[in-house]
Swiss-Prot record:
Annotated GO CC locations: cytoplasm; ribonucleoprotein complex; ribosome
GO molecular function: small ribosomal subunit rRNA binding; structural constituent of ribosome
SUPFAM superfamilies hit by this protein: Ribosomal protein S6
BP GO terms, sorted: translation
Matches recorded under Gene3D superfamilies: 3.30.70.60
Pfam families listed in its UniProt record: Ribosomal_S6
Protein origin, superkingdom: Bacteria
Name of the protein this chain belongs to: Small ribosomal subunit protein bS6
Homology family: Belongs to the bacterial ribosomal protein bS6 family.
InterPro entries: Ribosomal_bS6, Ribosomal_bS6_CS, Ribosomal_bS6_sf, Ribosomal_S6_plastid/chlpt, Transl_elong_EF1B/ribsomal_bS6
Function: Binds together with bS18 to 16S ribosomal RNA.
Keyword entries, A-Z: Ribonucleoprotein, Ribosomal protein, RNA-binding, rRNA-binding
Annotated gene: rpsF
């Protein structure tokens, strides 16, 4: 299993309950593929470095997990089709 880190930005107008639901949804997506989530940290609302689709701030969330490559591919697919996600990036951490 490899170590992965994903940072994603949720639209600022999303309600707090839905933010929590999205965090749990993405956590369960990787856990269903046999991954172990080692860290899930909500950074809160922050200003973006540059405007994305007329959005100037977003809710940042950081998640670290240990998984096989299939889990990160599935998470990437799910995040791409979710309209509440402004941006996301999944990186494989060095050994």
């Amino acid at each position: 299993m490899r170590n992965y880190e994903v940072m994603y930005i949720i639209k600022p107008e999303v309600e707090e309950e839905k933010v929590t639901a999205l965090m749990e949804k993405f956590k369960s997506v990787v856990e269903e593929k046999g991954a172990e989530v080692t860290k899930l940290d909500k950074w809160g609302k922050r200003r973006l470095a540059y405007e994305i689709n007329k959005i100037k701030e977003g809710i940042y969330v950081l998640m670290q997990f240990k998984a096989e490559p299939a889990a990160s591919a599935e998470l990437d697919r799910v995040m791409k089709i979710n309209d509440d996600i402004v941006r996301h990036m999944i990186i494989r951490e060095g050994e």
